[in-house]
Structure formats: structure tokens, C-alpha cells
From Swiss-Prot:
<dbReference type="InterPro" id="IPR036621">
    <property type="entry name" value="Anticodon-bd_dom_sf"/>
</dbReference>
<dbReference type="InterPro" id="IPR036754">
    <property type="entry name" value="YbaK/aa-tRNA-synt-asso_dom_sf"/>
</dbReference>
<dbReference type="InterPro" id="IPR050062">
    <property type="entry name" value="Pro-tRNA_synthetase"/>
</dbReference>
<dbReference type="GO" id="GO:0006433">
    <property type="term" value="P:prolyl-tRNA aminoacylation"/>
</dbReference>
<comment type="subunit">
    <text>Homodimer.</text>
</comment>
<dbReference type="Pfam" id="PF00587">
    <property type="entry name" value="tRNA-synt_2b"/>
</dbReference>
<dbReference type="GO" id="GO:0004827">
    <property type="term" value="F:proline-tRNA ligase activity"/>
</dbReference>
<dbReference type="InterPro" id="IPR004500">
    <property type="entry name" value="Pro-tRNA-synth_IIa_bac-type"/>
</dbReference>
<keyword id="KW-0963">Cytoplasm</keyword>
<dbReference type="InterPro" id="IPR002314">
    <property type="entry name" value="aa-tRNA-synt_IIb"/>
</dbReference>
<dbReference type="InterPro" id="IPR002316">
    <property type="entry name" value="Pro-tRNA-ligase_IIa"/>
</dbReference>
<dbReference type="InterPro" id="IPR023717">
    <property type="entry name" value="Pro-tRNA-Synthase_IIa_type1"/>
</dbReference>
<dbReference type="InterPro" id="IPR045864">
    <property type="entry name" value="aa-tRNA-synth_II/BPL/LPL"/>
</dbReference>
<dbReference type="InterPro" id="IPR044140">
    <property type="entry name" value="ProRS_anticodon_short"/>
</dbReference>
<dbReference type="InterPro" id="IPR007214">
    <property type="entry name" value="YbaK/aa-tRNA-synth-assoc-dom"/>
</dbReference>
<keyword id="KW-0067">ATP-binding</keyword>
<keyword id="KW-0030">Aminoacyl-tRNA synthetase</keyword>
Length: 566
């Protein structure tokens, strides 16, 4: 492709609203442009990268036995109502009405549509297992779109769905697609980890996220320093044991703590370590208010609270709800004196506290010498806190460290969550009606492009891995007015294309500095500069990833490039 014919508008300055490298560089290099908040156009170079990621995804999905189809982006509300998610999915689901006031959703995901499709066509175990996938635009009404393609309102996604007669069949396909995902992200050149995850609004049980390691990732990964264990911090269980001291219990005492609300303030004011304080929080679990206790140096994990109750929605109670429930402000909460009708659950660590402190449910006062079970009753002790760095790894090997990650893929064992809700059944080999067993497998295709750009860049621009680069080689005649340089550049361009390489020829009448700056921004793997030594049959070859350059004779160029790109 000749650069003079390409629509690739570059920017010299960093756009003001672009916070992270991938967003900045994809805009500056002319790979995309913003249409509205969280909505982007892919320009020609960006689209070439997107298509290369799509190709890798298709190859690995088909190798794993999945078959491609295409479902509608606009989905009837009745299907979502049938599954129950019309009411539970939340405000991220984009809803609309047609001229006849019939309700629809713009697809954030396609479980309902695919289940409806398959239940009408697959009636026998003889047609199972079946794995179908699509690559299609999805829509989510993000409250705060940010980070360019990493959190948008419109994005390209590959979603696959598998249907099975037995759990063993689901396990087999799940493992196969897990490996396919690992292959996809490895082929894209990414540094990633597969981690144990929460299924969230999707439902189901076993699930893994594929996380690209990056400091700008919105998720925290907890991983072992000596084993392969890795989990989203929300899902990492705490296996610590707590020993109760033999300190004698003291008499409960209420003390004034004026203007001291946070644990750090209270512990400093009372000269008590944070790990002897009891942090009390009120959560709304579906429609029920529950008091949750953790140790003062720990944080409540709301996903674990949700899983304790098998709830659909868990959120912090509002100040007004806390006031109505306990007649106190949030900063004075404590478990002592709470009405017996209100359930109190606590993390395991709370049970070992001796002579601790807690809020007194009265503004400006706390209790000291607090002892669980003597001073208040707990209905259940369980794992309710976030794991911390330095904790024992849940697999028993090593200690936990943290890293940030960008989620680019997610695989779920949905089980019968959707098939039972939507009456999607089949006849088994005994002629009995059974619900279809399902799996679900998603990849953020456009997000993967951003994740690659986030991992592969330097101070000068993008540095694309060969497998996804828009072109393999960038040929730059420095002076297009020079017949020797122009002709040699075109000859190299043509010969490399004949060898199967994708080549970009900078045939613009621009200054050398402009050409080189754009070349660094674009980040193609190999740059061939045709300069003053063209008359001698010599060009300069530069490897973008390493910055290494070498003068090469034209007759040796193809072999030299082949060694770089092998």
C-alpha cells in the first residue's frame, strides 16, 4: 500500500482526554478517531490490526471445533424478560422502543438469543455437543467510558456458546476453549494470565478471566510467588488461620471519640492496633439489610458477601438506610446492641479479637474491650475479606503478590442457568427431557487491540508484534525527488510484496523527519530506509522493537528481512 493513498491522519500532540498510552497512541497514529464518548471509528490502519486479531480468533475457534454464525444486535425484550435479566442486568443494558412501543435491547451479550435459537432447533442428544460463535458489535451504557477502547459503549466482541447433554461434555469443551484462548493471546504476543474469576451477571459456576498484565488494568490479580495460582482479587479465598490470644477479657467500656470516624483515626486516638478494631458495614443484599464485620486492617469483599447469600445484587446501604436501621451515622457503626432481627455475619478473623474496639452506634463514641459472642452474637463466621499481599496462597504454595490486569477474555460454565429459565430442553438417550447444559466464552476483540497497544509501545510510538501489525515492512525513500531513491523504494516495495510481505511505501513528498516520526508512531516491525547510498545499492534496515539498525545490500535484503520476521 502506498502511503500517499492512505487515510492515516497523525497527531503531533497528545489529545487532552486520552489518559493512557494505548488511547493516546492509537489516536496520534491515526488508527482511530472518537465519534462520541466511548464510541470510536477504526481508520484503515486500525482496522487492519482489528482484522488480524479477528483472523487469529477465527482460526483458533475453528480449530477448537466452533462454528461461526451471526445474530442480531437488536434483541426482543421478551427474551431478556424470560431469562430474568431484563430486570437484573442494570442500567448498562441499552433499552429502546420501536414505533409500536415494543421494547428491545441493544445486545450487551447474546445468551438469550442463542438459547432461543438452539431450543427451537436442537431436540435430541444426538445433535450435541454444539459450539457456535460470532464476532459482532456489542453495546453497554457505561456510566463513565474511559481509556479509549478499554472501556467503551460500543465494542467488537467474539462470543461463543456451547450446548451439551452432560457435564463431562461441557468440561471437555471448556478445557478445549480455555486452551484456544491461551493460543489466541499468545499469538497476539501478549503477556497474560488466566485467573479464577467471578461470573457476575452472567451466572454459572466455574469461570476464568484472561488478563493482560498492565499497570492501567482495572482489575487486581492475586497470584502466588512460587506456583501457577492466579485469581481475580474478588475470588481469591483467604486460607489464613487466626489464633485467639490468652489475654483475659476486660469489662466493656464506652469511650468518647470526638470527630474520630475512620479506623485509622480511631485506632490512633485510642492507641489500639487496627487489627484489634472491628470494622462494621451495612450491605443491602437484594432487599435485605445485613451487618458485615471484618477486622480493622481488612476490607470487605462484596463478591464474597454476595456468594454467601446467593444474591443477585449486593451494594453498600445508603446513609439514610443505615440511619433508619441503627439510628446512627456510618462512622459510628458497631455490632453491640443491634436488634436481634438484624443478621450479623463476620469474617473469620473477627472471632479471634480479644478486647477490641468497635463503634457504639452513637455519634462520637466507641466501645473498647469488645469481645465477640460475649458482647454481640454473630450468625455466621465465614471468609468475607479481600486477600492481601503477603497472605498464604490459597493453593498452599508460596505467598500472594498483586498485579494489575486488563480483562480481554472470559470463559464460563453456565450450566443450566439459561436453559432452565427459558425451557431449552432436549431428549436424552433414555427419552427423558433434560435442560441443555451450556458454556459461554467471550473475547473483547477491540479491547485486545488496545491491550496490545498498551503493552507494546515506547516513547516514540506503537511497536506492533508481527502477527497483528498492519504491515510487516515500512519502506521509506528519504527524498522522492531523487530518481535513484524513488525507483529503488518502489522496486523493494514490489519485490517484498511478491514474497508475501505486507508493505507500506512512504511515497509522500515530506521531509525525512516527518516520515521517520510517522514511522515510529505507526510501529511496523521493520523499516527500510532508502537514502543517499541508494546509488551504491545499500539501504538501512531498522528493527522497531529493538531500535537496532544495519546497512544491507539490496540483493541481500529479502534474506535479511526473512530472518527478522521468521
Amino acid at each position: 500500500m502506498k502511503q500517499s493513498m492512505v487515510f492515516s491522519p497523525t497527531l503531533r500532540e497528545v489529545p487532552a482526554d486520552a489518559e493512557i498510552k494505548s488511547h493516546q497512541l492509537l489516536l496520534r497514529a491515526g488508527f482511530m478517531r472518537q465519534n462520541a464518548s466511548g464510541i470510536y471509528s477504526f481508520l484503515p490502519f486500525g482496522l487492519k490490526v482489528l482484522h488480524k486479531v479477528e483472523r487469529i480468533v477465527r482460526e483458533e475457534m475453528e480449530r477448537a471445533g466452533a462454528v461461526e454464525l451471526l445474530m442480531p444486535a437488536m434483541q426482543a425484550a421478551e427474551l431478556w424478560q424470560e431469562s430474568g435479566r431484563w430486570y437484573s442486568y442494570g442500567s448498562e443494558l441499552m433499552r429502546m422502543k420501536d414505533r409500536n412501543a415494543r421494547e428491545f435491547a441493544l445486545g450487551a451479550t447474546h445468551e438469550e438469543v442463542i438459547t432461543d435459537l438452539v431450543r427451537d432447533e436442537v431436540k435430541s442428544y444426538k445433535k450435541l455437543p454444539l459450539t457456535l460463535y460470532q464476532i459482532q458489535t456489542k453495546f453497554r451504557d457505561e456510566q463513565r467510558p474511559r481509556f479509549g477502547l478499554l472501556r467503551g459503549r460500543e465494542f467488537l466482541m467474539k462470543d461463543a456458546y456451547s450446548f451439551h447433554a452432560t457435564q463431562e461434555s461441557l468440561d471437555e469443551v471448556y478445557d478445549r476453549l480455555y486452551k484456544a484462548y491461551s493460543n489466541i493471546f499468545a499469538r497476539c504476543g501478549l503477556n497474560f494470565r488466566a485467573v479464577i474469576a467471578d461470573s457476575g451477571a452472567m451466572g454459572g459456576k466455574d469461570t476464568h478471566e484472561f488478563m493482560v498484565l498492565s499497570d492501567v488494568g482495572e482489575d487486581t490479580i492475586a497470584y502466588s510467588d512460587t506456583s501457577d495460582y492466579a485469581a481475580n482479587i474478588e475470588m481469591a479465598p483467604v486460607v489464613a488461620t487466626y489464633t485467639k490470644s490468652d489475654e483475659a477479657e476486660k469489662e466493656l467500656e464506652k469511650v468518647a471519640t470526638p470527630d474520630q470516624k475512620a479506623i485509622e483515626e480511631v485506632s490512633a486516638f485510642l492507641n489500639i492496633e487496627a487489627d484489634k478494631c472491628i470494622k462494621s458495614m451495612v450491605f443491602k443484599v437484594d432487599e435485605k439489610l445485613v451487618v458485615v464485620l471484618v477486622r480493622g486492617d481488612h476490607e470487605v469483599n462484596d463478591v464474597k458477601v454476595k456468594n454467601v447469600y446467593g444474591a443477585s445484587v449486593v451494594e453498600l446501604a445508603s446513609h439514610e438506610e443505615v440511619k433508619e436501621l441503627l439510628n446512627c451515622e456510618v462512622g459510628s457503626l458497631g455490632p453491640i446492641g443491634v436488634n436481634g432481627d438484624i443478621e450479623i455475619i463476620a469474617d473469620h478473623a473477627v472471632a479471634s479479637i480479644v478486647n477490641g474496639c468497635s463503634g457504639a452506634n452513637e455519634e462520637g463514641f466507641h466501645y473498647v474491650n469488645v469481645n465477640p459472642e460475649r458482647d454481640f452474637k454473630v450468625s455466621q463466621y465465614t471468609d468475607l475479606r479481600f486477600i492481601q499481599e503477603g497472605d498464604q496462597s490459597p493453593d498452599g504454595n508460596g505467598t500472594i503478590l498483586f498485579a494489575r490486569g486488563i480483562e480481554v477474555g472470559h470463559v464460563f460454565k453456565l450450566g443450566t442457568r439459561y436453559s432452565e429459565a427459558m425451557n431449552a430442553t432436549f431428549l436424552d438417550e433414555n427419552g427423558k427431557t433434560q435442560p441443555l447444559i451450556m458454556g459461554c466464552y467471550g473475547i473483547g476483540v477491540s479491547r485486545t487491540v488496545a491491550a496490545i497497544a498498551e503493552q507494546f509501545n515506547d516513547e516514540n510510538g506503537l511497536v506492533w508484534p508481527k502477527a497483528v501489525a498492519p504491515f510487516h515492512v515500512h519502506v521509506i525513500p528519504v527524498n522522492m525527488k531523487s530518481d535513484a531513491q524513488r525507483e529503488m523504494g518502489e522496486n523493494i516495495y514490489n519485490s517484498l510484496q511478491e514474497q508475501g510481505y505486507e508493505v507500506l511505501l512512504d511515497d509522500r513528498a515530506e521531509r525525512a523527519g516527518v516520515k521517520f516520526a510517522d514511522a515510529d508512531l505507526f510501529g511496523l516491525p521493520v523499516r527500510v530506509t532508502v537514502g543517499k547510498k541508494a546509488d551504491e545499492g545499500i539501504v538501512e534496515v531498522k528493527v522497531r522493537a529493538t531500535g537496532e539498525s544495519e546497512e544491507v545490500k539490496v540483493e541481500e535484503l529479502q534474506t535479511y528481512i526473512a530472518n527478522i520476521l521468521k
